[in-house]
Amino acid sequence: MSDSLGDEYAPAFAPFLGFAGCAAAMILSCAGAAIGTAKSGIGISGIGTFKPELIMKSLIPVVMSGILSVYGLVVSVLIAGGLSPTENYSLFNGFMHLACGLSVGFACLASGYSIGIVGDEGVRQFMHQPRLFVGIVLILIFAEVLGLYGMIIALILNTKGSG
């Protein structure tokens, strides 16, 4: 393979796309976790003044939101592991790593937003009707799975570049 053909498949800007995917995975998934934590935390602090004994049971949305940032961290570590200053980095790998980061990032952002909305209203209604707890947890699980789907797609995409 000639140098000009190698430069065509591994241009100098290709690693930028990989770094952008790494950053997008962390930034967007942590933003989703922060939104979910903030929105559900507002509801928890609201019920804490009336029924402090319900605070520990109401922390489930906050914990579920925190897990979203772990999804972004896992994908970011995998992307960073594929970046090397001594090896050629193809344009395909750059776009693939960008797609990995955006996939998990936007999925976790949407998941965090939905966890925040359900968590906020759920804990407020749980204060009035404790029988709603199981239904709220099920809805939170379905909202959490959205972020997991993004991570699964990112992992599948990442294996395409290493295989």
From Swiss-Prot:
Lumenal side: 1-15, 80-97, 157-163
UniProt KW Kinase keyword: no
Intervals, Cytoplasmic compartment: 37-58, 119-135
Site (Essential for proton translocation): E144
Main location: membrane
MF GO annotations: proton-transporting ATPase activity, rotational mechanism
Gene Ontology CC terms, in alphabetical order: fungal-type vacuole; vacuolar proton-transporting V-type ATPase, V0 domain
Domain of life: Eukaryota
SUPFAM superfamilies, per database record: F1F0 ATP synthase subunit C
Transmembrane intervals: 16-36, 59-79, 98-118, 136-156
Alphabetized CDD domains for the sequence: ATP-synt_Vo_c_ATP6C_rpt1 (cd18175), ATP-synt_Vo_c_ATP6C_rpt2 (cd18176)
Entry's localization field: Vacuole membrane
Keywords: Hydrogen ion transport, Ion transport, Membrane, Transmembrane, Transmembrane helix, Transport, Vacuole
Membrane protein topology class: Multi-pass membrane protein
Function: Proton-conducting pore forming subunit of the V0 complex of vacuolar(H+)-ATPase (V-ATPase), a multisubunit enzyme composed of a peripheral complex (V1) that hydrolyzes ATP and a membrane integral complex (V0) that translocates protons. V-ATPase is responsible for acidifying and maintaining the pH of intracellular compartments.
Family: Belongs to the V-ATPase proteolipid subunit family.
PANTHER family, sorted: V-TYPE PROTON ATPASE PROTEOLIPID SUBUNIT
Oligomer status and interactors: V-ATPase is a heteromultimeric enzyme composed of a peripheral catalytic V1 complex (components A to H) attached to an integral membrane V0 proton pore complex (components: a, c, c', c'', d, e, f and VOA1). The decameric c-ring forms the proton-conducting pore, and is composed of eight proteolipid subunits c, one subunit c' and one subunit c''.
Name by which UniProt lists this protein: V-type proton ATPase subunit c'
